Amino acid sequence: MTYEEVTAMAAETGLPYAYDHFAEGESPEPPFLVFLYPRSDNFVADGKVYRKINELHFELYTDAKQPEVEEQVEAVLDSHGIVYDKTEVWIPEEKLYEVLYSMEVLNDGNEQEE
């Protein structure tokens, strides 16, 4: 899944979104979505990367528990056949809930042909 495909998937949620963070002073009112690739878990053999696999995070921020917004994000992930794990935390300093969707995606743009 390319960066452009992930961006399109974020747009499908209908929420404001950004990669990693919004610029200083440009953060929208919640709910909003941030996505990023915190690490990779590539398939390697014989000193060669055969499959590039990125960990992808979709971070949903809300100022109150909003199950309907979570369902909106999950519907998009489900429609793309994405398998994800979900965690939630309250961030007291920000007065926001973060619902984290963690998943692994193949980096199709860099797959090597066999």
What are these regions (language model features)?
Residues 1-57, 61-114:
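Long, contiguous binding/interaction regions
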